[in-house]
A protein has these predicted regions:
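Short, well-structured alpha-helical segments that form the helix of a local strand-helix-strand
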Residues: 111-118, 196-207, 275, 279-282, ...
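Internal maturation/activation junctions in enzymes
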Residues: 341-441, 450-454
Length: 549
């Protein structure tokens, strides 16, 4: 309700009572209208004031309705939003974000919260990520002012170097998982709570079950035939005593995965890489036609890396280096920095068209540079920094009057495979620390291989390597050929943006395959309040997609 202001109503009443009657301002003509007696004037004045009170009451009522409607509209638009003054967890699984916040309430670090949240997302959005996949952390330590990257993406097994990959699913598509090693290294360096404690919420969730969410339900429907045809997948994702997939809000359980998580929680990461879980991984992947060995698991290491950092409009962007999508994201923002975009840049249809044309062209040129980027032979970012330094010269190549349908016009020399789905998580802790992490099993449900012993769904990351034989217009990128221990190129771009005082201004990333880079670029531009729409352009499809926000 809106409280009436007596003073305002009194003022309105006085103005009405002191006003001359309407007829007093018109010259009276006795032949037209006879003069009124004083009682009639009083009656007329009373009726006029009565009408004004009614009008005021109606206007106030309308104002109340409008206010209520506006408030309801605000809540409808942001029904899933949660606002926090000192800390926050943003994930694509609502119950998982709550787990992350609870971990921080228990005095857990931002990394503790990230690990606990990711374990949960591996259940809630089991089609996108899980312990059978890999990830990239970007971590900010506010006390030291340092940012680091932990790369635990999947690597090619030692027996895969001479194979030409022709499948995007099944055993041959499975790379060596790195998720758990990534958790372990991040926890070793930045954890505060006991390792075991981070697993408890997800173990409970896996055992007790939870309703199928919208994202998982859509993935199940989209892949209905493959799920229902697989005994191991149907064991979890189908209704009891039926081979029909679960629907949104149906209860889902992961009892075997709960046992696996308990073992990793109690024994540690070696249970996965050098223990009973590892034994089952090798056995099951082999039965599915894959090549992972015990030695592959034992030799796997997560890498601590130096991030790429670029300054854009006074902010510093930190992203992973190659072979992630970070260098392309940095290059895009440096190209666009020179245009000095502002709200004025999208104030009219004509200006908006020009602004988005420039953005799309920047996307194309930046993705072309990505295809020419060499595979890093060391953790030195020299080659990447050389690529980013081309921003000014690339901007000069962008024409405001035309585009080009010839892909060689943009300088692309080879094609990289399109990546599958992912899951992203952003965290800011009360102490100012931050985590941006993207995790994936690559395609939806990864390789479509699930162990009926451990409950692990395995990735299909081998599909992200370039094939030697390719029928595309351009040759495959040789720097992305499969080699033992190599990580494939990726669009994953978990980013952290700091201001000049080293305060976190944005923790950002995305899921959605190759659109990760362009979506993250536009969200980063939004930090500078430059645009209010998200625009995607996946070079080189030449079909931009626009989403208002």
């Amino acid at each position: 309700m809106v409280e009436e202001n007596p003073d305002e109503i009194n003022v309105l009443s006085e103005d009405v009572s002191n006003a001359k009657p309407l007829q007093s301002e018109i010259k009276q003509d006795d032949n037209i209208r006879p003069s009124r007696s004083e009682p009639e004037r009083i009656k007329t004045r009373f009726n006029f004031r009565k009408k004004m009170y009614c009008i005021i009451a109606v206007l106030l009522f309308i104002a109340v309705i409008i206010c209520i409607g506006a408030i309801l509209h605000l809540f409808q638009r942001c029904s899933a939003c949660v606002f926090h003054q000192n800390a926050g967890v943003a994930s694509d699984g609502e119950p998982c974000s709550k787990i992350g916040r609870e971990i921080m309430k228990w005095n857990g670090s931002s990394v503790d919260a990230a690990i606990a949240t990711l374990l949960c997302i591996g259940l809630v959005n089991a089609h996108s990520m899980g312990i059978g996949g890999g990830l990239i952390f970007t971590i900010y330590n506010a006390s030291t002012g340092q940012v680091e990257v932990i790369n635990s993406r999947e690597v090619a097994p030692e027996q895969e170097s001479t194979r030409s990959l022709e499948t995007v699913a099944g055993g041959p598509s499975i790379a060596v998982p790195g998720e758990i090693r990534g958790y372990a290294l991040a926890h070793q360096r930045h954890g505060r709570l006991p390792w075991k404690q981070l697993f408890e919420p997800s173990i409970w969730l896996a055992r007790k079950g939870f309703p199928v969410g919208k994202s998982l339900a859509i993935a199940l429907e989209t892949n209905k035939e493959q799920i229902e045809a697989s005994t191991s997948l149907c064991d979890v994702f189908c209704k009891k005593n039926s081979n029909k997939i679960l629907r949104e809000n149906d209860m889902i359980y992961f009892p075997k995965l709960a046992i696996t998580l308990r073992m990793i929680a109690d024994i540690g990461p070696n249970a996965f890489y050098d223990g009973p879980i590892g034994d089952d991984i090798v056995k099951y992947v082999s039965q599915s036609g894959g090549q992972i060995s015990l030695n592959d698991l034992k030799q796997y290491k997560a890498n601590k890396e130096t991030p790429i950092n670029v300054t854009v409009d006074g902010y510093t962007l930190y992203v992973p280096g190659a072979p992630s999508g970070g260098p392309v994201l940095a290059l895009i923002l440096k190209i666009l920095e020179g245009y000095n975009f502002s709200r004025e840049s999208v104030s009219t249809q004509e200006k908006k068209a020009l602004t988005y044309h420039r953005i799309i062209e920047a996307f194309k040129f930046a993705f072309a540079e990505r295809s020419n980027l060499e595979y890093p032979t060391s953790r030195d970012n020299t080659k990447v920094n050389e690529m980013i330094s081309k921003a000014s010269s690339i901007r000069k190549k962008i024409s405001d009057s035309h585009t080009n349908k010839r892909i060689d016009y943009y300088g692309i020399k080879c094609l990289l495979p399109g990546q599958g789905g992912t899951s992203h998580l952003s965290i800011v802790a009360p102490d100012g620390n931050a985590v941006s992490v993207t995790s994936t099993i690559n395609g939806r449900f990864g390789s479509f291989v699930r162990s009926n012993v451990t409950g692990i769904i395995f990735n299909n990351q081998m599909a992200d390597f370039s094939q030697h034989e390719d029928n595309n217009r351009l040759p495959p990128c040789s720097q992305n050929y499969v080699q033992p221990g190599r990580r494939p190129f990726s669009a994953m771009s978990p980013a952290i943006i700091l201001d000049k005082d080293k305060k976190v201004k944005m923790v950002v990333g995305a899921s959605g395959s190759s659109r990760i880079i362009t979506a993250t670029a536009l969200d980063s531009l939004a930090l500078m309040d430059r645009i209010k729409e998200r625009l995607y352009h996946v070079p080189f499809d030449f079909i931009p997609l626009l989403q208002s926000v």
